[in-house]
Amino acid sequence: MNRNNQNEYEIIDAPHCGCPSDDDVRYPLASDPNAALQNMNYKDYLQMTDEDYTDSYINPSLSISGRDAVQTALTVVGRILGALGVPFSGQIVSFYQFLLNTLWPVNDTAIWEAFMRQVEELVNQQITEFARNQALARLQGLGDSFNVYQRSLQNWLADRNDTRNLSVVRAQFIALDLDFVNAIPLFAVNGQQVPLLSVYAQAVNLHLLLLKDASLFGEGWGFTQGEISTYYDRQLELTAKYTNYCETWYNTGLDRLRGTNTESWLRYHQFRREMTLVVLDVVALFPYYDVRLYPTGSNPQLTREVYTDPIVFNPPANVGLCRRWGTNPYNTFSELENAFIRPPHLFDRLNSLTISSNRFPVSSNFMDYWSGHTLRRSYLNDSAVQEDSYGLITTTRATINPGVDGTNRIESTAVDFRSALIGIYGVNRASFVPGGLFNGTTSPANGGCRDLYDTNDELPPDESTGSSTHRLSHVTFFSFQTNQAGSIANAGSVPTYVWTRRDVDLNNTITPNRITQLPLVKASAPVSGTTVLKGPGFTGGGILRRTTNGTFGTLRVTVNSPLTQQYRLRVRFASTGNFSIRVLRGGVSIGDVRLGSTMNRGQELTYESFFTREFTTTGPFNPPFTFTQAQEILTVNAEGVSTGGEYYIDRIEIVPVNPAREAEEDLEAAKKAVASLFTRTRDGLQVNVTDYQVDQAANLVSCLSDEQYGHDKKMLLEAVRAAKRLSRERNLLQDPDFNTINSTEENGWKASNGVTISEGGPFFKGRALQLASARENYPTYIYQKVDASVLKPYTRYRLDGFVKSSQDLEIDLIHHHKVHLVKNVPDNLVSDTYSDGSCSGINRCDEQHQVDMQLDAEHHPMDCCEAAQTHEFSSYINTGDLNASVDQGIWVVLKVRTTDGYATLGNLELVEVGPLSGESLEREQRDNAKWNAELGRKRAEIDRVYLAAKQAINHLFVDYQDQQLNPEIGLAEINEASNLVESISGVYSDTLLQIPGINYEIYTELSDRLQQASYLYTSRNAVQNGDFNSGLDSWNTTMDASVQQDGNMHFLVLSHWDAQVSQQLRVNPNCKYVLRVTARKVGGGDGYVTIRDGAHHQETLTFNACDYDVNGTYVNDNSYITEEVVFYPETKHMWVEVSESEGSFYIDSIEFIETQE
């Protein structure tokens, strides 16, 4: 289970596993294992063991020695490959001693200096003296520290009960980890990343090896399970970081060397070979240091090829008439690359090499040279033979038979056979060990200039064993010729040897005691629709790609274990869409798994693009399988692919199943999961534990066997239920199960349309929340306020949750500041769960296993973009002084504002982390003081606005109870007061308009009074809809009359002289009324508003566009003016009419108000 804690400063992650040895498993049990558990409560049960499952930090390392950088790297890689074949813990001390002796052979930094010089020469760039000395000094310190740690580890392993040994090794481990953290940046100096790359790769390799030790020994050192998980997460995080760094700068260095001529190609070619051996081969092993994923060891397969230099006369300088090939002007970079480097292909083995010889005369002399060759090769475990021919094939031939183990060394002689007029480059001798000899004749015997090649110079043997590290797999060839005056001037026939590592298993052997790696590039034959790609450097070889349904490839395997042995399957893949993989054994399906996308279309393949997924084995569709014969055929198919997607497979893994051991591992895992929830006293939950972790621990316990571990299961269930109760008690959110939405209670969840609650499902043990996409300008949201009364001043709080999938989900925590988090979580938690026969229809054991694997594959997020994609999240917010004058609760807001956004999430909780202290407290106090000062400034400003608005509203009424409107005021005065009220800021939260801001209460107070004034104004006005807010309702109109809007203001517009608008009124006869009109005339002519009664009495207010003074104030034709007239109606029916003579007439409001005498 991973957990990603995200705030402004940090993002944290964590997974887990456990693995007892076979020696510890005993079935059947000699005595009842449950007897001691009777009458015991869960706290006693959890205290029963000496192990402590609460929290940890860790680090391991590696060393190398040899006469030069390449040999040292080959020696290190070879030893690591051997160590990875068995569990690490049994050989760790000798393994570290070997690495120390290899990398610091005489306790100095000569090897590291060799690494630096190697790349400096390849790229022709010197490391600055300061950077070199600084790096070497730090490397010397790392070597010394690692040596101390190795000895401390050796002493502790010799006597694990010695408390001094324990405290020393634990302290040395922590110190060495920090040494690496501080040292690694010195090997990545800006501008010198490429020449320092070999040093960087070897150093980070040691760091990752060190970090692995936390998982191996952390419990014995007294680390809590949480601490161990933290170290494990750092190992995963740094594996991705270090891998991507090495891959990026390898490619950068290679691209910088790309040129146009022979010399540039040679430098490019050498850099590619040596950096593959020194950097990429090491990087490809990083994932196998994960002892949770590979507890019993594995056999990594480095299937990549390397090429030694072309066999051609190319000494450092010309010799007499002879010319070194590197300076020739007639071969281009691209033709050499195309001729010498094979296109991506399936892994194959060389069966035989038949070399043709041809005689080239120069005057009376001649040379028999290697003119071409025919290769016979086979794909692994395939009887079909592939044949390739290069160059000129003649009848004079020599056949090389590499034998079962293959050729591992070749000594060759390249000749420049030249006169003053003509020259030819050729190879006249090559000795293959083992394999045979090609030997051509020259006349005279010592004719021509010679250059001797020994492949051991470029691929030296492992220094510790003297054994060769590579075998010959292919030979490419390049022929060229230039003419002058119709005759040959220069010609050449140049072979290049291609090599693969000798430890690649040519039989695809399946063993019962370790996880077998089957790279799909080791398939037995090409398949239509499947493309072989040169994999990224970190895959260690080629990968296969498909874009349609069909067969990826067929692997022929050799089973070296009893046919009763059970296995399960894993796959390492990358994809831009969802698809399924099905594996068949001899045509019978033995496993299928649905996989989600791991990358976006068009993205480059990075380390994070690849995920390892297990084919679940607990369900009826993917039971553990067995092999039926010693030679089997495994077919890997792609199914259910999406159109336009790209689907990549790196490898299939065959994992031995030990039911007895795995059952005990399940119990141990459940114990760890449950125990790690609690504090050491078992009375409370650990601060970093989330509600989601509690639910997943409950699932682990539920999956334990009732028959084997009935009482253990009972105790663990009691404990995990207690943990769930503690989780609910500490959760400050009301109704975390979403039982009631939009209740009438003050607090609790408030939500918009588009929010639904789902019950359970394969990814949540409880209820889940679903937010649909927004509707144009209407977001989908749900929020809740945590009241200040339950908060503490200067305290950190954390919001946790689990997102199944989301797009544009915004998560906000609001106090006196806002913490904003956006989650774009891919829908990659593919559920292959099946019904277990229960009412829920969900097999929690199967679901738990799948989801945990996918979450473990998320790694630690490297940046905010990756953090946005993790399923688990945590967001932090700190409280200040909880100023009593402001309602300072914490608002929790979830919303989707985009029309294609969505979210499904659950396990929400807001918990107290603890009081702030030190720098965090000081920073919060400073921020809080600034906030209070700013609040005071804003309040002073708002107080001025509030006082002005309140005075304006007071003027609207004649009484203190706001029951009677001032007869002298009209709509203009109400609008003026409204504008003042609307100028109040901080009424609503910037995050969501439904959340009140700090000035919400005063705004509401004034708004309520304004509404009362508007109501009284509307009630007293005999003219219906006199402010035209309801358009032309209640008005009789002709054409060319309309209502327009400008902001909150509505006004009647007459745009033609024949337009008329009128309304009939009912009034009290013989009472005093005032007709008040606010209007504006534009253009020529006049505008008229006339009032008349049934007795033919009338009054008219006239408006025109001429300039004039109103009470001594100049008014232009863009201003609205108000005119009024007193009228005494003699009938109860009245008419108001609006017209104009020409131009346009704009009327803001018409009032006919009864007044007192």
Curated annotation (Swiss-Prot):
UniProt entry tagged with the keyword rRNA-binding: no
A Pfam family per the record: Cry1Ac_D5
Family matches, as InterPro entries: Cry1Ac-like_dom-VII, Cry_V, Galactose-bd-like_sf, Pest_crys, Pest_crys_dom-III, Pest_crys_dom_I, Pest_crys_N_sf, Pest_cryst_cen_dom_sf
SUPFAM superfamilies registered for this protein in UniProt: delta-Endotoxin (insectocide), middle domain, delta-Endotoxin (insectocide), N-terminal domain, Galactose-binding domain-like
Keywords, alphabetical: Sporulation, Toxin, Virulence
Any single biological process term in GO: sporulation resulting in formation of a cellular spore
Coiled coil: none
Molecular functions per Gene Ontology: signaling receptor binding; toxin activity
Gene3D superfamilies: Galactose-binding domain-like (2.60.120.260), Pesticidal crystal protein, central domain (2.100.10.10), Pesticidal crystal protein, N-terminal domain (1.20.190.10)
Function: Promotes colloidosmotic lysis by binding to the midgut epithelial cells of Lepidoptera larvae. Has a fairly broad spectrum of activity against members of the Pyralidae, Plutellidae, Sphingidae and Noctuidae families. It was the first insecticidal crystal protein characterized with activity against cutworms. No activity is observed against some beetles, such as the Colorado potato beetle.
Entry's family note: Belongs to the delta endotoxin family.
Note: Toxic segment of the protein is located in the N-terminus.
Identification of the protein by name: Pesticidal crystal protein Cry9Ca
Organism of this sequence: Bacillus thuringiensis subsp. tolworthi
Encoding gene per record: cry9Ca
